[in-house]
Design a protein with these regions (language model features):
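Extended ligand-binding groove/face enriched in aromatic
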Residues: 124-128, 135-272, 388
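CBM-like carbohydrate-recognition segments
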Residues: 21-103, 117, 122-124, 129, ...
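Bacterial Sec-dependent N-terminal signal peptides
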Residues: 1-22, 467-469
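Extended ligand-binding clefts on enzyme/binding-domain cores
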Residues: 218-335, 342-353, 365-399, 403, ...
Length: 469
């Protein structure tokens, strides 16, 4: 038996050597190995405006159906059309997202920009319709609140804001649209929001927006975006007070940045407590996104010759360098930016993509250096948009902590509204970028060119005039 086994085994070993042809081995001599297709974890490479438009349309179609603009009886669900007779049973019809949250303020600004970039009127109509609806129903809910002492909590956020979260982002978006459409009846809402921001929001002794949580006299990096863009926009809305509001916006920005920016990291800390002898650096990604977005919003409004514009720009560019150095190989950024074992987060990534693309489009930063970063980031963000149009991988609302575990274990959820506006805004700005720059694959890498390259060769040089159209 052992003899037979050995004989058969010997035959099996010998047969392949006789029967099989010699295979060609891919090696350095016969193959340009540097052109082998890499095993990317996500999408990498070419991107078209049409492709981006399809992605943001999917998100738009989802939020459009999930944010109805109707008043209903909370007990019966019946739609109320006569607002003059409604009582405390009236509330906004509930969808997946709130119409007057700060997250939706970002969404409104994003859709205003998307309408400009794409010419798609649906985006503009979405914002117009909801702003007109809120302006129409707000006085009736105010009447109910005056008579009954209570009304829908979502309207109270508009009528009686108690934090910058309640006021700033929606106020800024309303001003943007009001400046484009003089018939938009939101002046009363704008004034109510802005009165809170400029006159009632808690501040440090030097006037910096602050909170008394989680500690007394705490600066939240988030509040840069929750307050400063609205003040900057007010300089365009109330032109008689333009200089006052520009000065206030710049003052707020620099007083936040001087305390919270960490030069050696090129990042912002999330929180700063006035009474603390040390100021820990937990560089939460989304808050850093709000800070970068605030700089963009402020620079958009500041005149080129404004005395402190260079200082704002210096902070912005230093922040861009710090953030882009920490992008993951998948294209997303980490929840705590400088801690690679924290999870990859979508909303912050989308904000960075918008800011980078916007800054390139404005000529503030270099397309060669940062265009590929933005494009990789967009590919990663687009990969987080599911078939229904929901945005996956977004951290839920987050407070402040001075330990890493808090940030590492924040849940993610498709109903975290923070992801939708940034994704729409990033997509709109990427479309603008792709329409003005000319990214092309060269030696397997994304490169950005100011002029369209004629060649389709996998590797090419650009030092000859005949490569350009």
């Amino acid at each position: 038996m052992n003899y037979r086994i050995i004989t058969v085994a010997a035959l099996l070993v010998a047969l392949p050597a006789v029967a099989q042809k010699k295979k060609t081995v891919v090696n350095d001599s016969n193959t340009p190995l540097h052109l082998l297709r890499p095993a990317y974890q996500g999408t990498y490479g070419d991107l078209s405006p049409e492709q981006v438009k399809k992605d943001i349309d999917r998100v738009f179609n989802y939020i459009d159906k999930e944010t109805p603009a109707r008043v209903v009886d909370k007990n019966t669900g019946k739609v109320i059309t006569d607002y003059t007779t409604m009582g405390d049973e009236a509330q906004l019809e509930r969808g997946a997202f709130r119409l007057a949250s700060y997250e939706w303020g970002v969404t409104y600004s994003a859709l205003i920009a998307a309408a400009e970039t794409t010419g798609d009127q649906r985006y503009a109509d979405y914002v117009q319709n909801r702003f007109r609806f809120l302006a129409e129903v707000a006085p009736h809910f105010k009447r109910v609140y005056t008579e009954k002492g209570k009304t829908d909590s979502q309207l109270l956020q508009i009528l009686t804001p108690h934090a910058l979260d309640d006021a700033g982002a929606v106020c800024a978006a309303m001003i943007k649209l009001r400046l484009k459409d003089q018939t938009l009846p939101v002046d009363g809402l704008i004034q109510n929001y802005f009165d809170f921001i400029i006159n009632k929001e808690y501040r440090l002794a030097d006037g910096t927006f602050a909170r008394n949580r989680p500690q007394r006299n705490t600066l939240w990096l988030d509040d840069m975006f929750m307050g400063i863009p609205a003040v900057a926009q007010m300089s365009c809305y109330d032109k008689e007070s333009k200089n006052r509001y520009l000065a206030e916006a710049v003052k707020q920005f620099l007083q936040f940045a001087d305390r919270m920016f960490i030069p050696e990291k090129g990042l912002y800390r999330h929180g700063w407590v006035e009474s603390s002898t040390d100021h820990p650096a937990f560089c939460w990604a989304r808050a850093n996104g709000w800070a970068m977005l605030t700089a963009c919003e402020l620079l958009d409004v500041l005149p080129e010759d404004y005395p402190q514009r260079p200082k704002v720009m210096d902070y912005f560019r230093a922040h861009v360098r710090g953030v882009t150095a920490l992008q993951s190989g998948e294209g997303l950024w980490h929840q705590l930016l400088d801690r690679n074992d924290s999870y990859l987060e979508t909303s912050a990534t989308a904000i960075y993509v918008y800011c980078l693309a916007h800054a390139i489009n404005k000529g503030w930063i270099d397309a060669i250096a940062y265009g590929p970063v933005a494009q990789l980031g967009w590919h990663a963000v687009a990969g987080k948009i599911n078939e229904e149009g929901q945005v996956e991988g977004t951290c839920v609302g987050t407070g402040m902590a001075f330990d890493p575990a808090f940030y590492y274990y924040r849940p993610v959820n498709v109903y975290a509204a923070h992801g939708y506006g940034p994704v729409l805004w990033a997509g709109a700005e990427m479309i603008r970028l792709l329409n003005t720059q000319h990214p092309q694959m060269n030696d397997s890498a994304v490169q950005y060119y100011q002029e369209k390259q004629k060649t389709t060769a996998p590797i090419f040089a650009v030092d000859k005039e005949d490569t350009k159209e």
